[in-house]
């Protein structure tokens, strides 16, 4: 069977694209490798921007996907200056694996789903041949269009486009934890071990500590920062339940955003659509997926799709580039210290509270 569109990846970008493109009656195949043994490493917080995007589709999050506690503020810690401030934020704390499964369940049955890992994509005449490893067998599918929704490690982007965008290694550990005395969500800065940020998040009976680290010496710096943090907060981080890691993009320039051409297109983080300041990518994944699905639904001409998709995602690129400048205030120690020292935009903790 030859498909009109093959989607690689069934996260928020891929599932949204599949759901929207299915309205066009095209022949669609979506391929994803995530399962209970191969989960996507993620902090699992749904930011307000992403919540707003789901509201446009009248999508609600079932309580089974949410975990305890729900979050209304973030405790911001600078390990060098020892300054701590609190800022109001509204995140949904959730199980990321169940969240992705729920989004896949919303895809109409008319879309074929294959659980497997894409190993190769090649152009052959007027079609793309997509090789998929499923149950230790290589199966080849053909399609007129390939959409890469496979995140930072995108095989689609690596195969067809230059992948020079800056990357971090996101590393996080899970710990068994029944002590809820510390804040439920903390954001950590430590310029000596990372040029980015780290986080502490409670999820039911677990505590997650993770961060985005420069690729060079990432494991060493993770361990150094972890030791520094545990001593500062007097927090026991020795009872490790599991450790996970994945690459994450940090866009810096317009050229880091690659939307695609000639029947091979990228959405979500695979296209570079992720916040360089907070690394929130779900809202951009949904936006880019919706834009491309609407364009392909009405057009089969590669040139028209390429031109319109590039033009209609310009607003998204500008928004993310603005966050490059926001990052300067967040990650420049001098500017951040001024903001935190004077309590700009922070909320005051009541006396006697930990």
Predicted regions and their residues:
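Glycine-rich FAD pyrophosphate-binding loop
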Residues: 6, 22-42
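Redox-cofactor binding/interface segments in oxidoreductases and associated redox assembly factors
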Residues: 8, 148-149, 266
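N-terminal Rossmann-fold NAD(P) dinucleotide-binding loop
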Residues: 14-15
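A conserved beta-strand/loop capping segment in the N-terminal third of enzymes
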Residues: 47-102
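Predominantly flavin-linked oxidoreductase catalytic cores and closely associated redox partners
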Residues: 108-236, 272
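FAD/FMN-dependent oxidoreductases across multiple families
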Residues: 120, 217-292, 301
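Active-site-proximal substrate-binding core of FAD-dependent oxidoreductases
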Residues: 294-331
């Amino acid at each position: 069977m030859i498909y009109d569109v093959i989607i690689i990846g069934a996260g928020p970008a891929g599932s949204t694209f599949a759901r929207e493109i299915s309205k066009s009656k095209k022949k669609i195949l979506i391929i994803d490798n995530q399962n209970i043994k191969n989960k996507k490493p993620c902090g699992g917080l749904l930011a307000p921007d992403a919540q707003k995007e789901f509201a446009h589709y009248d999508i609600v999050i079932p309580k089974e996907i949410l975990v305890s506690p729900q979050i209304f503020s973030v405790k911001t810690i600078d390990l060098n200056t020892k300054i701590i401030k609190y800022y109001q934020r509204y995140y949904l704390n959730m199980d990321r694996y169940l969240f992705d499964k729920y989004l896949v369940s919303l895809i109409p049955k008319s879309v074929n789903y294959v659980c497997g890992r894409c190993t190769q994509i090649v152009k052959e005449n007027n079609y793309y041949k997509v090789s998929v490893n499923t149950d230790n067998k290589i199966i080849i599918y053909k399609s007129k269009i390939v959409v890469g929704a496979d995140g930072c490690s995108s095989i689609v982007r690596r195969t067809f486009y230059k992948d020079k965008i800056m990357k971090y290694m996101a590393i996080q550990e899970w710990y068994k934890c029944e002590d809820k005395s510390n804040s439920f969500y903390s954001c950590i800065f430590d310029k000596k071990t990372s040029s980015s940020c780290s986080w502490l998040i409670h999820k039911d009976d677990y505590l997650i500590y993770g961060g985005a680290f420069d690729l060079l010496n990432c494991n060493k710096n993770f361990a150094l920062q972890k030791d520094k943090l545990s001593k500062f907060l007097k927090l026991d981080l020795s009872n490790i339940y599991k450790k996970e890691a994945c690459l994450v993009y940090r866009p810096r320039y317009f050229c880091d955003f690659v939307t695609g051409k000639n029947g091979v297109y990228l959405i979500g983080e695979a296209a570079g659509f992720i916040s360089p300041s907070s690394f929130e990518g779900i809202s951009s994944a949904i936006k880019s997926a919706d834009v491309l699905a609407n364009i392909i639904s009405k057009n089969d001409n590669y040139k028209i799709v390429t031109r319109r998709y590039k033009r209609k995602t310009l607003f998204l690129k500008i928004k993310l580039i603005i966050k490059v400048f926001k990052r300067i205030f967040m990650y420049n120690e001098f500017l951040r210290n001024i903001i935190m020292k004077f309590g700009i935009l922070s909320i005051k903790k009541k006396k006697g509270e930990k």
